[in-house]
From Swiss-Prot:
GO biological process, one term: carbohydrate metabolic process
Function description: Catalyzes the reduction of the glycolytic intermediate dihydroxyacetone phosphate (DHAP) to sn-glycerol 3-phosphate (G3P), the key precursor for phospholipid synthesis.
Organism per entry: Desulforamulus reducens (strain ATCC BAA-1160 / DSM 100696 / MI-1)
Name of the protein this chain belongs to: Glycerol-3-phosphate dehydrogenase [NAD(P)+]
Top EC class for this record: oxidoreductase
Catalysed reaction, written as an equation: sn-glycerol 3-phosphate + NAD(+) = dihydroxyacetone phosphate + NADH + H(+); sn-glycerol 3-phosphate + NADP(+) = dihydroxyacetone phosphate + NADPH + H(+)
Length: 344
């Protein structure tokens, strides 16, 4: 049994805390707001994960020092834009040998850094030997109800990925390992952009053909950027790549898809975000990915058009027309290049 601190009290943090508690770990969850901690201590996070009766051993507190005291593992389940701040606040209370696990799917907007890089910038590069990320197709609403789910734990050190695998894995929550930290982080973050775009197509009333094209070509541009940043191309064919992309682009639970639908139906960006009533990571990630693509010299047409809709007022319908009106391409040449790069 491990003593685990869960930093965050949203739907995903609560669902994963439930998994950990059901695995007989001692889990204390940190909530920023007292009323949220009270809901969790009463047995149900009615604000973010309604309908899920929490494990009796799971409890929450607003005292960060108390939550982190002597924790063997610290799981950060907060949105990417709050990650650095909570690292800074937590650092004085985290044991020097504690394992750090991040479960957020995003990139830091102000620096364009992956979240493992953010952690290394605050704790030093040595922290990466005990750092891992958990990602994959996994909506909190289903995980909380013990619906069978498969995810991937990635870390630079395979023993760290295996530690996370042992910590979380259960009959209903299957965990694979992957040494490609870069690819798993990017897959989890970038699929939110494609989900926004697919949602916009939904909102415009386009059909399954359009959505299939968006998802397939979206995966191609995610893979191009990932490869340029040092990721293993095969990662994007796995749970953190195509797996997460499918569920985020198609599920009624997907915040990014729902936000995109609202935009496609004519709502302003602010109105669309407010209609979701939760953090929509894909909006910030679109800005970061647009900058990264420019810096890396990588073509990302869906990201480009989504960026123009979100930040420069391009109409969603014109964005789709721009994508359909691009110059001729040869798909086989792209696939051949990817295969060649894997072999090399």
């Amino acid at each position: 049994m491990a003593k685990v601190a869960m930093i965050g009290a949203g739907s995903w943090a609560t669902a994963l805390a439930q998994v950990l508690a059901q695995n007989n770990n001692s889990v204390l969850l940190w909530a920023r707001r007292p009323e949220l901690a009270q809901l969790i201590n009463e047995g149900e996070n009615k604000r973010y994960l309604p309908g899920v009766q929490l494990h009796p051993s799971l409890s929450a507190d607003t005292d960060l020092e108390k939550v982190l005291h002597q924790a063997e593992a610290v799981v950060f389940g907060v949105p990417s834009h709050g990650f650095r701040e909570l690292l800074q606040k937590s650092r004085p209370y985290i044991k020097s040998d504690a394992f750090i696990i991040n479960v957020a799917k995003g990139l830091e907007e102000s620096t364009l850094l992956r979240l493992s890089e953010v952690c290394a910038s605050e704790f030093g590069e040595a922290v990466l030997s005990r750092y891992a990320v958990l990602s994959g197709p996994s909506h909190a609403e289903e995980v909380g109800l013990n619906i069978p789910t498969a995810v991937v734990a990635a870390a630079q050190e395979i023993r760290m990925a295996e530690y996370v695998q042992d910590l979380f894995m259960s009959q209903d929550f299957r965990v694979y390992t992957n040494p490609d930290l870069v690819g798993v982080e990017l897959g989890g973050a970038l699929k939110n952009i494609i989900a926004l775009g697919t949602g916009i197509a939904d909102g415009l009333g386009f059909g399954d053909n359009t959505k299939a094209a968006m998802m397939t070509r979206g995966l191609a541009e995610i893979t191009r950027l990932g490869y340029s940043m040092g990721a293993n191309l095969l990662t994007f064919a796995g749970l953190a790549g195509v797996g997460d992309l499918i569920v985020t682009c198609t599920s009624m639970h997907s915040r990014n898809r729902r936000c995109g639908i609202a935009i496609g139906q004519g709502k302003t960006i602010q109105e669309a975000v407010e209609s979701v009533n939760m953090v929509v990571e894909g909006i910030r990630t679109t800005h970061v990915a647009w900058e990264l693509a420019k810096n890396q010299g990588v073509e990302m047409p869906i990201t480009e058009q989504t960026y123009q809709v979100l930040f420069h007022g391009l109409s969603p319908r014109d964005a789709v027309l721009n994508l359909m009106g691009r110059g001729k391409k040869n798909e086989v040449e792209e696939l051949s290049l990817a295969t060649y790069n894997i072999i090399q």
